[in-house]
Design a protein with these regions (language model features):
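Generic hydrophobic alpha-helical scaffold/packing signal
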Residues: 220-223, 303, 337, 362, ...
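Conserved GNAT acetyl-CoA-binding A-motif
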Residues: 93-115, 341-352
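Conserved acetyl-CoA-binding loop-helix of GNAT-fold acetyltransferases
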Residues: 79-90, 325-337
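A conserved beta-strand-loop-helix scaffold within acyl/acetyltransferase catalytic domains
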Residues: 2-45, 49-62, 108-110, 126, ...
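Short, charge-rich binding segments
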Residues: 83, 90-96, 131-132, 146-150, ...
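Active-site/acyl-donor-binding loops of N-acyltransferases
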Residues: 4, 17, 115, 119-164, ...
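A short, internal acetyl-CoA/4′-phosphopantetheine-binding micro-motif in the GNAT/acyltransferase core
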Residues: 71-78, 162, 317-326, 354
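Catalytic phosphate/metal-binding cores of nucleic-acid and nucleotide-processing enzymes, i.e., regions
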Residues: 67-69
Length: 403
């Protein structure tokens, strides 16, 4: 038996489960307002056994497609529950004239650090879930090999509070964070007051990567939808302050070099000259930056984080590549996670990575020593058997063309 439930009922069930995630929060459909939505509870008598926030996409000729991101929330180890829920979902799908229902449960096939990933066995829970979903009538799309083949990433990099810390990271990552601090990069946390700078950094990221992301209206919608469970982390540089500081350092180095010359200390002379050259290089860079940006405080990197239950998601991140030598993105992402854990979250998802654990996303996120999580992937629940295969084939072609 199933029925429509309130947002409070749904969020309570999801938050009390071991599958808590942002995409199954009752507020997420407000972000995806180009889809319809429904909150359904599934019951055995008076006992709720599952919950689903369902997105509904209208299709031509009055048909629809249903999508349950990172859900439904239920005990996948219980075949009876899985069978009942899928039966009820099909019944609901028929009322919506759905061709099929797509879901990608928050169940893992692997959860392990990167160095042990290849040789680690599959999680028993994941294998059981795949088996039960298939036995209940769902079609599994398999262990897809490309990030673009699924709606949600099948692989992600996740940081856990009980395993997170600067001491857990490589010497190179620690050095990058230290460099950023030493160069005067400042971190602040905020919300709407940082939106314009955040959107500008995202636009720079779009231009650099040649991709289309979102605009300021969408980022504002995220903050508005999760007003008490969102924050922007912004790294910035006070260019004038930094310039003044290193000009003074350069003067000191020049004085020390003269003293060393007088004392005939050749090694010290060279050390001071190297320092002077390094500082002059940065002085020239900052003077050019002042001309180019026409502002003293310049945003370097930023992230936008949303929370639900005791979980946190780093949803969007941007940077200004002009200041890449200041290592601001690494510092920003570190502080973003640190903030998440200070706010009581048990994990902070850094988002999807390439399925073969290579490429830019993986290379950057692996610097933080995350847990690599492989999901069981997508499942299709056929509703209209007559049209399901043809419509799913068309969907797959469109997905491939748009990836």
């Amino acid at each position: 038996m199933y029925r429509e439930i309130t947002a409070v009922e749904h969020d309570r069930f999801v938050s009390e489960s071991n599958q808590t995630n942002l995409l199954q929060s009752s507020n997420w459909p407000k972000v995806k307002d180009n889809w319809g939505s429904q909150l359904l509870g599934f019951f055995d008598g008076e006992t709720q056994i599952a919950s689903a926030s369902i997105l509904i996409k209208s299709l031509p000729l009055g048909f629809s497609m249903l999508y349950i991101p990172r859900g439904p929330i239920m005990d996948y180890s219980n075949l009876d529950i899985v069978t009942k829920v899928l039966k009820d979902l099909k019944a609901f799908g028929k009322k919506q004239r759905a061709l099929f229902i797509k879901c990608d449960p928050l169940i893992y096939l692997k959860m392990v650090n990167a160095k042990d990933f290849e040789n680690s066995p599959d999680e028993k829970e994941g294998l059981i879930a795949i088996d039960h979903l298939q036995r209940a009538g769902a079609d599994w799309t398999g262990r897809t090999t490309d990030l673009a083949h699924t709606i949600q990433p099948r692989f992600q990099a996740n940081l856990y509070a009980n395993q997170f810390g600067l001491d857990k990271m490589s010497k190179k990552t620690r050095q990058a964070i230290r460099t950023s601090k030493n160069k005067g990069v400042d971190i602040q946390f905020g919300s709407h007051e940082l939106l314009e700078d955040f959107a500008e950094l995202m636009k720079k990221t779009e231009d650099r990567k040649g991709i289309n992301l979102r605009g300021i209206d969408y980022y504002q919608k995220l903050l508005d939808t999760y007003p008490n469970n969102s924050y922007i982390t912004m790294a910035s540089l006070d260019v004038a302050k930094r310039l003044e500081k290193i000009e003074k350092e350069c003067q000191i180095a020049q004085s020390e070099r003269i003293k060393s010359l007088e004392l005939n200390r050749e090694k010290k002379v060279k050390q001071h000259q190297d320092t002077i050259d390094r500082l002059n290089k940065e002085i020239d860079f900052l003077k050019e930056a002042q001309k180019a940006y026409d502002r003293d405080i310049v945003p370097l990197a930023a992230t936008l984080t949303l929370e639900f239950g005791n979980t946190s998601e780093n949803i969007y991140a941007g940077m200004d590549d002009y200041f890449k030598s200041y290592s601001a993105p690494i510092y920003t992402w570190f502080e973003t996670a640190q903030r998440a854990f200070e706010r009581g979250n048990i994990w902070q998802n850094m988002g999807g990575i390439e399925n073969d654990l290579s490429g830019g996303l993986y290379h950057f996120k692996s610097k933080f020593e995350p847990i690599i999580e492989e999901f069981i992937g997508e499942f299709n629940i056929p509703v209209n058997r007559l049209l399901y295969k043809a419509s799913n084939h068309v969907y797959a072609l469109r997905k491939k063309r748009n990836s």
